[in-house]
Structure formats: structure tokens, C-alpha cells
């Protein structure tokens, strides 16, 4: 069995959202905010010969933080793909932002740690 290596970087952001399709009076329909964490995992079976690693963790951190900063202190609903800003759609949004530059991307996790909620997208 071939070993598989996975590396993960995490970023944080704060953002507001609301769920417009919720019934009138629902707390989820009202504008509210959360602190979020997002983690991106890249997988490889073979390490880079020149460096002995799966990928450059610094570059992964840069790209993940750049994506998170796009959302930071903003309204999630304003971003294409996040009109219904569930954790699931946030996972898809981050995957779509990173997938082109990170072919080994295998997992995105978005969490709201203060309320103990998270979603994992396995690619």
C-alpha cells in the first residue's frame, strides 16, 4: 500500500449573512454574523523531489488567506455562489477558489467554532 501524505493550512474570517428563504420571523432570516475557520488539505502520494514535501505550506497559506480575506468583514450573501450562505456552500466556494492552483486539494472544512458547527467537503 502506497503511503499518502496530507498537509493542511487554516485561516479565519468574520462575516455576516442571512438566509432569505427562511420563514418570516426566523432568526436565520435576520442579518447576523459569525467567526469562521476554513482549512484546506492537499494530498500527494509522491513528495516533491526538490523539497521533500507535498507542497509549499506557505503558498497554500497565502492562497487560503487571500480567499478568506475576500469574505472577511463582509456580507456573504453578496458573493456569487453564496446567495444561500450555508457552511456547505462556503465549502464549495473555497474549493472553487483553490482547486485550479491546487490539483491535490482533497478536503475543505469550514467551521463556526463558537457554536460548534462545521462542514467537511471531501474532493
Feature annotation, model-predicted:
Residues 1-123:
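Charge-rich, low-complexity N-terminal segments
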Amino acid at each position: 500500500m502506497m503511503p499518502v501524505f496530507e498537509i493542511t493550512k487554516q485561516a479565519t474570517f468574520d462575516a455576516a449573512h442571512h438566509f432569505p428563504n427562511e420563514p418570516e420571523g426566523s432568526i436565520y432570516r435576520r442579518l447576523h454574523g459569525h467567526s469562521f475557520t476554513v482549512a484546506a488539505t492537499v494530498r500527494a502520494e509522491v513528495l516533491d523531489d526538490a523539497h521533500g514535501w507535498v507542497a509549499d505550506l506557505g503558498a497554500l497559506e497565502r492562497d487560503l488567506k487571500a480567499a478568506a480575506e475576500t469574505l472577511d468583514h463582509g456580507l456573504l450573501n453578496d458573493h456569487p455562489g453564496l446567495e444561500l450562505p450555508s457552511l456547505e456552500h462556503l465549502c464549495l466556494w473555497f474549493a472553487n477558489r483553490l482547486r485550479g492552483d491546487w490539483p491535490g486539494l482533497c478536503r475543505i472544512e469550514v467551521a463556526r467554532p463558537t457554536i460548534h458547527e462545521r462542514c467537511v467537503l471531501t474532493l
